[in-house]
Amino acid sequence: TGDKAIGNDILGNGASASKTVRSEALETETSLPNFRQGDAIILYERNRDTDNVTNKMVFKGNIEYLTENEIGIRLRATQQNPSVLPAESLYAIEHDTMDTTFRSMYQGLYIYLSARKERRDLLLSQRPPRFDESLDPMISRSEDDFTRIALKAKAAQDYFLLIGPPGTGKTSCALKKMVETFHADKDAQILLLSYTNRAVDEICKSLASIAPAVDFIRVGSELSCDEAYRGHLIENELSSCNRRSEVYERIRNCRIIVGTVAAISGKPELFRLKHFDVAIIDEATQILEPQLLGILCARGEDGKDAIDKFVLIGDHKQLPAVVQQNTEQSAIYDESLLSIGLTNLKDSLFERLYRNCTATVHRSYDMLCRQGRMHPEVALFANRAFYGGRLIPVGLPHQIESSDTICRLAFYPSVPEKAGTSAKINYSEARIVADLAARIYEDHRTDFDESRTLGIITPYRSQIALIKKEIESLGIPALNRILVDTVERFQGSERDVIIYSFCVNYPYQLKFLSNLTEEEGVLIDRKLNVALTRARKQMFITGVPELLERNPLYKSLLKLIESF
């Protein structure tokens, strides 16, 4: 609350019109907002304490940009009458929730129940996935890992699972090679999906690097799409079409369709227009089963499966799907479901199929083991603790650099906040992070790149805002543009240097920090794994050692750092 509108640009001349409300914060006490760009919000006038969403006109939208003094909001519905948002009024912004995901999951369950028996049996592990063994000689002669993976994906007749640990190139190389392999068949139709829009941007980046160029259409919104790929958005691709027949032909003739799972789920008519030979789904371990069922069980106008086979790419040792229920609430106790590997509703389809495949030593899965991101010393803990030492450095220049003059891994102890202070902020860590950021900037002044050099991870939005405030006080403009965010937002990205602020002030917070799973008796902290594997060259950690040492994995990490 406490935002005053200073400019209304609310046009009503069509869907493409700007629908942005700009506002500036009043000069009140310092606040730490827990909003970020792209968040779904509701906006309403709030000039009295009694004003709220139940007695004021509510507008829905998304945050287009957010600065220290200004918020830009893109309204979902164009307003033709500017007087509904008077410039002299005060406004409140609250987080909004979307029921689209829940609706699509219910629809997905219905589509599954009405799917062909053969597809239902496959997804319920009532029949094993089939594999074309005629390609075995080519697979055995593969010149590199990515060619082998692509050929195995081609040979799989039902599904193929690819485990891609951090830095192994599962999107930039493996997915790209699969697309090239499938696209070589002149008639092949390919559907490419991921969970987040940022990951879809990465898929588009991989597609754009293919030579000769491939034609693709992206399903999604402009706000959620990187500017470089907005020309491929379906609304732009179809803007020149004047007749439905032209729309039909454009979609039919484009052999690659790209989008998030949510975007494609919201366009079921796509499967009545096109039949896909393969669907390749990245970030599959972050997607719950009901979110995928509607797509994998879709049927075309002829009643046949709209998708012949699918490839799931992910890493069950990195972050899973985000759900509100705890493990006990989502546990499965039905014997028939347990018999097919469905043990918990929080698990992804990828995890269940992977467990079933490994139990039968089946060939419909593979794992990438050569990583080109982290220096071996940076990767040491995660490689030993979570991957059994199987990750091998590719040997890129930054991976073979000497560590004689550079600190690869360091811990900076902080102190907890005083009782009565919010548990979700730590001023000493914010100052440590800002000081480290300034030193890193000085070390890289000539080649500092805010999108590549430095990133900062911390678990709470309040701590994010505090760190940004401390960094802004340094007066270094380039540092104001670096990414400071939660570990969930960092999955899939990398930086030369990562700073991780644990922000633990009380023992009970340790449970929130972890996301535990177990494989072959080994305890794996998926959040810690992601945080430690974002850095290419250096990893710096700050936290309260007395509290962190209460967690066995964190204690082992601190012990390893001491040995450097």
PLM region spans:
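Pre-ATPase regulatory/linker segments immediately N-terminal to the P-loop/RecA-like helicase/translocase core
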Residues: 29-151, 155, 208, 213, ...
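Beta-strand cores of modular interaction/reader domains in eukaryotic scaffold and signaling proteins
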Residues: 34-36, 42-44, 62-64, 72-74, ...
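Phosphate-binding Walker
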Residues: 160-163, 169-176, 202
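Accessory interdomain/linker segments of ATP-dependent helicases and helicase-like nucleic-acid enzymes
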Residues: 1-49, 425-427, 431, 437, ...
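Conserved P-loop NTPase motor core of helicases/translocases
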Residues: 84, 135, 179, 187-279, ...
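Walker A/P-loop NTP-binding motif
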Residues: 171-185, 206-208, 298
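Pre-Walker A (Motif I) flank of P-loop NTPase domains
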Residues: 156-162, 187-188
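Conserved helicase motor core of SF1/SF2 NTP-dependent helicases
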Residues: 184-188, 196-198, 262-264, 270, ...
